[in-house]
Amino acid sequence: MEFREQVLDLLAEVAENDVVKENPDVEIFEEGIIDSFQTVGLLLEIQNKLGIEVSIMDFDRDEWATPNKIVEALEELK
């Protein structure tokens, strides 16, 4: 499976919403698709399933505002 697909699948699982795969430019925080509790879960899942450690201190909502931005950020970290 392609890395991008893995990230989008993981995001859809955490968000419990497939809109993140259907519209990867959706503003996930502004639209209320992911809240702060789910953000922590997302970071844990990224570490567990993708082996990429992202500290909550390194997490920036503006840089992670859309699924596409999340894929880009993780590409740089892997």
Curated annotation (Swiss-Prot):
GO molecular function: D-alanyl carrier activity
Domain Carrier residues, every copy: 1-78
Recorded superkingdom: Bacteria
Keywords: Cell wall biogenesis/degradation, Cytoplasm, Phosphopantetheine, Phosphoprotein
Localization terms from the record: Cytoplasm
Any one Gene Ontology BP term: lipoteichoic acid biosynthetic process
Any coiled-coil regions, as ranges: none
InterPro entries, A to Z: ACP-like_sf (IPR036736), DltC (IPR003230), PP-bd_ACP (IPR009081)
Main location: cytoplasm
GO CC annotation: cytoplasm
Post-translational modification: 4'-phosphopantetheine is transferred from CoA to a specific serine of apo-DCP.
Pathway: Cell wall biogenesis; lipoteichoic acid biosynthesis
Residue numbers bearing the O-(pantetheine 4'-phosphoryl)serine modification: 36
Biological function: Carrier protein involved in the D-alanylation of lipoteichoic acid (LTA). The loading of thioester-linked D-alanine onto DltC is catalyzed by D-alanine--D-alanyl carrier protein ligase DltA. The DltC-carried D-alanyl group is further transferred to cell membrane phosphatidylglycerol (PG) by forming an ester bond, probably catalyzed by DltD. D-alanylation of LTA plays an important role in modulating the properties of the cell wall in Gram-positive bacteria, influencing the net charge of the cell wall.
Similarity comment text for this entry: Belongs to the DltC family.
Protein name: D-alanyl carrier protein
Organism: Staphylococcus carnosus (strain TM300)
Gene name for this UniProt entry: dltC
